[in-house]
UniProtKB/Swiss-Prot annotation:
Glycosylation sites: N197, N319
Name of the protein in its database record: Sugar transporter STL1
Keywords: Glycoprotein, Membrane, Repeat, Sugar transport, Transmembrane, Transmembrane helix, Transport
Disulfide bonds listed in the record: none
Organism: Saccharomyces cerevisiae (strain ATCC 204508 / S288c)
SUPFAM superfamilies (alphabetical): MFS general substrate transporter
One Gene Ontology term of the molecular function aspect: carbohydrate:proton symporter activity
Length: 569
């Protein structure tokens, strides 16, 4: 029998099975920390331009961004373009993942994203007045965006596939919540450096992106690939080793082999499906099209319900629509970002207890009411009404941090099928960045024309989101990714909506998932039904166990020992 060794698993450039010498919960904690680092970088980028775009030194270095009067349309367009060009880069990165993500794997994409982010930040930081400075800054923003697009499309999928069903939502919610903490850090750094009368005022905040990216890069170099992805690439031995490592169990344990067999079987249901974009939009029992549209809708409505209009331009909103002076607007913007970060704490308790569906509904309803208050107060401008408008903004960011901040990053990889999970998540993330670009580009122009009209538009979009959630979003809390496949297949067979099936279908064990899959005929249309008979998992189990039963105890080779010694040292 073949002797499994970790050295046999190493690729040409990176190891897919390295794990810092950690196992079980400690390894999962490290995976969570790496994911949080990636999304805190994303949040930092979101908050970065809020105060910089109208900062004195930034406007001096890039004169085209300086407004001359309250209705300088040219300057507001340049401000919008300088801020939103980042989203175009993010879109390009997400598009790359959608087409190539399944072939490359989760870990290499995150490493690539980190390196590209560093390159982009260096380009932007080194822009100097008189040397096509604004063009260089924008190019750096776009390059940074490409790196962020790779990371935001990949990290949620990677962490979802590395997590247990019972705490998957909590762990992915942690990474989403760190977006708010990254934004808060950016706001307060911008405020602190606003007293500086040199280019350090904007260069230091921009260069801080490098620090976040370096931390993510350092974590990821020795964190493992997703076992589900390894199985999809017929690298079952590596997957079995990693499942045992994540469970802190011997790869020969019956539970480990059974889990790998179930994953193997789930992946093989679509093994013969062609690797093309058309797979993402297939229908039938897989319902990939419906799942992709649901995933994309979470990101579409996250943007068009007003979150980044408030986050990217909070200082501008307080200054222009609520008529606070610039310095006070920056302070209130910092408080705004702090409340945003603190509001995410509540989501840790609600994400599993309340569930995804109810939390979506709570968030959309609360945001709709909040923006209704803001727009109503701004119709007739005076000092008292301005305070009411500010209250509406603070209520909005509280509801957003509690719900719709994290959910669009948790939900898409949960509802996607294994074969197109990376593509589905990338498709939803592409939707995010296109909508994000539109909102960030046109919000300053919209505000300049009609402050209250801007909030009325976002309030209406929030009200429209409520029926979309109610009629199309199934509950996924506490369910394995394979159970969710069953929900959509059963909805197709019964001619009903997935949310109805999810409400009535009890939680399933691994064997019950397989029984339902056989009963529903959840196999690829190009394959024969007999390939998925009731003994399939048992056959897979016997094959995996028989091929490798005597070998896995030898997995700890010299490389693993050295890695562990170096880490502990």
């Amino acid at each position: 029998m073949k002797d499994l060794k970790l050295s046999n698993f190493k690729g040409k450039f990176i190891s897919r099975t390295s794990h810092w010498g950690l196992t079980g919960k400690k390894l999962r904690y490290f995976i969570t920390i790496a994911s949080m680092t990636g999304f805190s970088l994303f949040g930092y980028d979101q908050g970065l331009m809020a105060s910089l775009i109208t900062g004195k030194q930034f406007n001096y270095e890039f004169p085209a961004t300086k407004e001359n009067g309250d209705h300088d349309r040219h300057a507001t367009v340049v401000q919008g373009a300088t801020t939103s060009c980042y989203e175009l880069g993010c879109f390009a990165g997400s598009l790359f993942v959608m087409f190539c993500g399944e072939r490359i794997g989760r870990k290499p994409l995150i490493l690539m994203g980190s390196v590209i982010t560093i390159i982009g930040a260096v380009i932007s930081t080194c822009a100097f007045r008189g040397y096509w400075a604004l063009g260089q800054f924008i190019i750096g923003r776009v390059v940074t965006g490409v790196g962020t697009g790779l990371n935001t499309s990949t990290i949620p999928v990677w962490q979802s596939e590395m997590s247990k069903a019972e705490n998957r939502g909590l762990l992915v919610n942690l990474e989403g919540s760190t977006i708010a903490f990254g934004t808060m850090i950016a706001y307060w750094i911008d405020f602190g450096l606003s007293y500086t009368n040199s280019s350090v005022q904007w260069r230091f905040p921009v260069s801080m992106q490098i620090v976040f990216a370096l931390f993510l890069l350092a974590f990821m170099i020795k964190l493992p690939e997703s076992p589900r992805w390894l199985i999809s690439q017929s690298r079952t031995e590596e997957a079995r080793y990693l499942v045992g490592t994540l469970d802190d169990a011997d790869p020969n344990d019956e539970e480990v082999i059974t889990e790998v067999a179930m994953l193997h079987d789930a992946v093989n249901r679509t093994k013969h499906e062609k690797h093309s974009l058309s797979s993402l939009f297939s229908r039938g029992r897989s319902q990939n099209l419906q799942r992709a549209l649901i995933a994309a809708s979470t990101q579409f409505f996250q943007q068009f319900t007003g979150c980044n209009a408030a986050i990217y331009y909070s200082t501008v909103l307080f200054n222009k629509t609520i008529k606070l002076d610039y310095r006070l607007s920056m302070i209130i913007g910092g408080v705004f970002a702090t409340i945003y970060a603190l509001s995410t704490i509540g989501s840790f308790f609600l994400i599993e207890k309340l569930g995804r569906r109810k939390l979506f509904l709570l968030g959309a309803t609360g945001q709709a009411v909040s923006f209704t208050i803001t727009f109503a107060c701004l119709v007739k401008e005076n000092k008292e009404n301005a305070r009411g408008a500010a209250v509406g903004l603070f209520l909005f960011i509280t509801f957003f941090g509690l719900s719709l901040l994290s959910l669009p990053w948790i939900y898409p990889p949960e509802i996607a099928s294994m074969k197109v999970r990376a593509s589905t998540n990338a498709f939803s993330t592409c939707t995010n960045w296109l909508c994000n670009f539109a909102v960030v580009m046109f919000t300053p122009i919209f505000i300049g024309q009609s402050g209250w009209g801007c909030y009325l538009f976002f309030a209406v979009m929030n009200y429209l989101y409520i029926p979309v959630i109610f009629f199309f979003y199934p509950e996924t809390a506490g369910r394995s990714l394979e159970e969710i496949d069953i929900i959509f297949a059963k909805a197709y067979e019964d001619g009903t909506q997935p949310w109805r099936v999810a409400n009535h279908l009890p939680k399933l064990s691994l064997q019950e998932v397989e029984d339902h899959a056989n009963a529903l005929g959840s196999y690829d249309d190009e394959m024969e039904k007999e390939d998925f008979g009731e003994d399939r998992v048992e056959d897979t189990y016997n094959q995996i166990n028989g091929d490798n039963s005597s070998s896995s105890s030898n997995i700890k080779n010299e490389d693993t020992v050295n890695d562990k010694a170096n880490f502990e040292g």
